[in-house]
Amino acid sequence: MNNLLITALVFAADKHKNQRRKDAGASPYINHPIALANVLANEGGIANLDVLCAAILHDTIEDTETSEAELLEYFGNQITSIVLEVTDDKCLPKEERKRLQVEHASQISHEAKLVKLADKISNLRDILASPPADWSNDRKREYFEWAREVRNGLRGSNHKLEKILDELIERKDSF
């Protein structure tokens, strides 16, 4: 394993150390970025170190006090650029952020599309396995429908990951 990937894991673990996922067990947040890297490497066949590091770091700017300058200092321009492409502007209302994800999905780099695919796969799996306790079945279906809309802009990025995401999206009717 490359030292940069270990550095990204340690960095993300520190940044997310006080955060929990919304699942029933309130699992440590770091499980999510690790899951993305696992999906990319072991299911998508992705070995690109920049993509794997960006997957580990993908929520650091959006959900912690991490700055773009900090990521640049530790991880350089390419990884930081990928992270920025998949980072929502938390100053915007949630519905606007969701709309922009759909609108921008087809315009982001190939590397960012891979991270976005893995993010959607991880989130849908988590919702299926252990959804947030306060989510109704309608809310779960809405999330799956939104993931489908984002997925449409990610086509042509990685056949294996797209197939996994397609199969997960089809399960929305199980709610």
Residue ranges with predicted function:
Residues 1-175:
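Active-site helical microenvironments for divalent-metal-assisted chemistry
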